[in-house]
Every structure is written in structure tokens, then in C-alpha cells.
Amino acid sequence: MERENTVFAEELNPTFLFMWKGTRVEDEPNYHCHEHLELCYIQSGTGKHRIGDTIYEVKEGDLLVINEGVYHQSLAGEHKTPVAEFYVGLTDLNLAGLGRNHFPLPGNCPVFRTEGELQRKLSKLCMAMEAEQELCRIGRYYMMKTYAMQMLLLLLREEEETGKPQKAGGCSFESANRKYLVEKITDYFEDHYAEKISLDRIAGNMYLSTFY
């Protein structure tokens, strides 16, 4: 039977290793690699990451996917402004057609520029994982593993939906105009829920006609 839009359980059943959250104000001392897959979500601030032979500028909402054996180093940037980083370590990931602990990278770019709904979902997963670690309740490992797997699945779904469009300096998940506008309108409702909202006001803020 042909495999179509399906991730088999034996492929996406990684071992959860760790999560770590910290604020970086100095360069990471070592240019290094791991024998596991590492995710780094930028929760706030701006900085730089050296991944392979390329230095990427990173900002809030970016998700870095560092495959096994890839050398990398977190850099604070010229102004050394604080960068809040959230790391997740996984191993035993075996996706079809890829090496062990390798995740597909559109255009071979390890930096995913997330925004809108995807960014909100990733942020919530990071917060849920952090809360689970602090609670130390029964089944903590499996809860944290589930959250990490959701992060990977969200990326796979976005790659499938958007056809892997590119943006300079990273992989953008901005899709068709309609989806983009829906996300912007949703953001507007969340920011102004306590105010009186009219169609004219929404259209004015979105630079749209009320007919559209």
C-alpha cells in the first residue's frame, strides 16, 4: 500500500531527552554538535545562530531545527541583547527517507519563521512543557514527549499546507493571502476584545474594503 500523507508510529515515536529554558546574553562558548535532534524556539529578543557554515539572524517566533551531527552555536549578537531560548532534545526519530534524528528542512534551511496561529501554538506548547516539568506529577515524561511531538507535527503540517515557500534568511510559513488575513483578523479580535468592534473598523485597520 502506498504511503500518502501519513506518518507511521514507528517513525514519529522519539525518545524525549530534555527541555531547557534560558536567557542568553553572551555567546555560547563552543561550536558543537549532538547525537540527537535539538529544537530551539526563540521566545523573545533577537540574536544570531551559527548553524553549519551559515550565521542566521533569529527573532521571537523563530524555531530552529538542528539535526543530529550538525555543528551549531548560539550567538548573542553585536548588541548582546537578552534572547530567551527554549530547547527541546529528542532522539530515536526515524522519518522515512531521512537519516536518524533528522527532520525535513525546506530548502535545507534550519530556521523556520513562524507567525500567526502557528507561533501561538508553539508558544503554548513551550509553556505547557515548562509547567509540566515544574509540577513533577505522574506521567510527566509522557506529557512532555507528547508536547514535543506536537511541535514536530505542526511543522510537518505547515510544510504540507503551504508548499514550503521561502523567505530570505529563513523558511517562512506565510501562506495564501486569505489565510494570512484570517490570522490578522483573529489577532485583532484578541487584542481588542474589550472594545466595541465594527466591520468598518476592522476593514480600516486591515486596509480592506468592507465588501471584501
Language-model features: locations:
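Linker/hinge segments immediately adjacent to helix-turn-helix/homeobox DNA-binding domains
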Residues: 152-170
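Amphipathic alpha-helical segments enriched in hydrophobic/aromatic residues interleaved with Lys/Arg
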Residues: 102-150, 154, 187
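Generic protein-terminus/edge-of-domain signal
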Residues: 1-63, 70, 76-78, 94, ...
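Short, locally clustered residues in the helix-turn-helix/winged-helix DNA-binding domain
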Residues: 43, 156, 190-194
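Basic/polar phosphate-binding segments, predominantly the helix-turn-helix DNA-binding elements
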Residues: 184, 188-212
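A generic fold-level signal
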Residues: 11-13, 34, 58, 80-82, ...
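N-terminal positioning helix adjacent to the helix-turn-helix/winged-helix DNA-binding module
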Residues: 118, 174-185
